Amino acid sequence: MGKVVGIDLGTTNSVVAVMEGGKPAVIQNAEGFRTTPSVVAYTKTGDRLVGQIAKRQAVINPDNTFYSVKRFIGRRSEEVSEELKQVSYIVKTDSNGNIKLDCPSLKKEFASEEISAEVLRKLVDDASKYLGESVKQAVITVPAYFNDSQRQATKDAGRIAGLEVLRIINEPTAASLAYGLDKKNNETILVFDLGGGTFDVSVLEVGDGVFEVLSTSGDTHLGGDDFDDKIVQWLLKEFETEHSINLKSDRQALQRLTEASEKAKIELSNLSQTEINLPFLTATETGPKHLERSITRAKFEELCSDLINRVKIPVENALKDAKLDSSKIDEVVLVGGSTRIPAIQELVKRILNKTPNQTVNPDEVVAIGAAVQAGVLAGEVKDILLLDVTPLSLGVETLGGVTTRIIPRNTTIPTKKSEVFSTAVDNQPNVEIHVLQGEREFAKDNKSLGTFRLDGILPAPRGVPQIEVTFDIDANGILSVTAKDKGTGKEQSITITGASTLPSDEVERMVNEAQNSAKEDKEKRDKIDLKNQSDSLCYQSEKQLKELEGKIDDTNKNKISSMISELRNAINNENYDEMRDLNSKLQTALMDLGKSVYEKTSKEQTSTSSPTNSNDSVIDADFSETK
C-alpha cells in the first residue's frame, strides 16, 4: 500500500497531511504555504488556476473565480438561498434542481464536485512531489453535520480527482484524534469547530487510544463567510448613503468588498480597530469613488450579534444528547479559523464555564487528525479505536406524510437496523420507499435522500404483506437502503431519483474529463518548462561566450551564436519540437566548448611550469651558532 494522505477539504482553505516516522505532519504546497485557498479560477485563455494564484486574481476575474464551493456541494439551490447571495460568480440550477456554477470563460457549467476535485488534485499533486511517490488514496474530512448527499458528493469529488477515498471522517472527530493522540488519561472533550462555511460541535470520550463520539450537533449554514458578509452588507449601506450608489450588482466591487471584509475580520481578532480603504471602488460621470471606513471590534460584534448567538443552540443540543452538563467537560478544543474571533471565545468560555484549550493549531488540526486516520487504515498507526456517530436521524415516510425514524441521531456507526412495514390498501402490488434524513416529524420538512419502489408484492389484504426495510450506514456515514418482501423474498436497493448527488454516469464522465485535462495540463506544463529552460540556456550561453572572449576561436563562437539565434526564433515562434532539438544540440556544443577550453588551458599551464634550465649542482655552506 502506498502513502495515504489526510485532507481537510475546507470552505476557505484546505490542508493535506501525512504520517511520517509515526508522527502526523502537514505538507507545504508548491508555493511554500501550509494552507491552500479552496479557490479555482479559469482565465480568458482557458487556463486553470488553483489555490493562492487563483485567489490573487479574483478581483479582476470575479465571474470565473469559484470559492466557498463547499457550501453548495451535495445541495439543491433552495437549500442555499442565502449563500447564493454571498458569491460574485453566477450560480444556475439544472432541470433536477441541482446547482451548477457558470464559467463564462469556458462557456461551460460546473458541478460543485468538479471544482472541489480541482482543489483536491492540487493538494494531492503537491503531496506527491513532497513524498516522491504518486498519491492515490486519501482520507477526506467533512463537517459532522453533513447529510448523506453532501458526504456522497464529497466522495464523488475525490473520485473525480483520481483518488480512492478510503474514509470520510467528521471534522471534529479528526480534530479529537490530533488532540488526543498521545493522551493516556480519559477525558471528556467538546470540540467546537467554526470554519469558513459550517459549524459543528461534538462531545467525545478520549483516552488510551479510544475515541468515542457521544453526540454531535451543528449548523451547516453558519461559518466565517457569514461574518464577512455582515461587514460587506454594512459597507454597501455606508457607501450608498454617502454616494447614492448601489453596488450590489457590481461583481468586481463585491469581490473587493468581500476580500477587504475578510481582512478586517482577521485584523479585529488582534486589534480593537482597523481601516478599510478601497480606492477607485467604482466611478460615475463625476469621477472615481473611493471607500474609506474605520470599523471597531465593538461594531463588528454588534453587526454579527445574531451569528454569535446562533452558536449557543448546537452546543446546548450536543450536551443534552450526550446527557452531560458543562461541568463534566474536561477540555474545550477550538477548531477552525473563525474561532479566533474574541467574541466567539468569550461566548464559549461563558456558556461552558471553561477557558478553551488553544494548544492545537485551528487551521491544521483537522488535516492532522485525518492523517492519523489514514495511518490507521494504512497500518502505520496501531491501537486506535474510533467510534463515530450519525449526526441526523434517518427514516422513511409513512401514511399521512409522517417520518418514521429507523436510526436515531447520534447512533454509533457503522450500524444496521431494520423495521417491518406493510401495505396501506388491499392487493397493493408495490410500495414506494421514501428515505428521509432530519429531526422534523413530517416528511416534507426533512431532507429527501431518494425514493425507490419494491414491485411484485402478492395480492393480499392490507396489513398482511411484510416489507422489511433495512438501513445500513457504513463507517463513512453513507447510507444504503434495501426493502425485502418477506413473503416472496424479492429485494430492491435504493436508486437515488431526486437527491442532490450526481448520477453515476455523470461522475464517470467527470472522471474521464478530469483525466484528459490532467494529461493536457501536463503537456502544457512541459511546454512551459521547455520554453523557460530554453530561454535560460540562451542566457547562460551568451554569458559563457562573453566570459570566454579571446579563449575560443571565431569558428566555435559563430557556431554557438548561430545556435542561440535559432533557439530564440524557435522560442518566439513556439516551435516546441525544434526547441527541444536545438536545446539538446546547444547543450552538447557548450559541453564540447568547455572541454576544448579546459584542454587548451591545461596544455598552456603544463608548458609554463616546465623547467628551462636544469642544474643539479650542490652548494656547500658552513653555519656557525651565535650566542
Swiss-Prot record:
Residues 604-617 have a biased composition (Low complexity). Residues 597-627 are annotated as: Disordered. It is found in: Plastid, Chloroplast. It comes from the Eukaryota. Pfam families: HSP70 (PF00012). GO terms for molecular function: ATP binding; ATP-dependent protein folding chaperone; unfolded protein binding. The keyword ATP-binding applies. Keywords: ATP-binding, Chaperone, Chloroplast, Nucleotide-binding, Plastid. GO terms for cellular component: chloroplast. Acts as a chaperone. NCBIfam families: PRK00290.1 (NF001413), PRK05183.1 (NF003520), prok_dnaK (TIGR02350). Belongs to the heat shock protein 70 family. This is Chaperone protein dnaK. It comes from Guillardia theta. The lineage of its organism: Eukaryota, Cryptophyceae, Pyrenomonadales, Geminigeraceae, Guillardia.
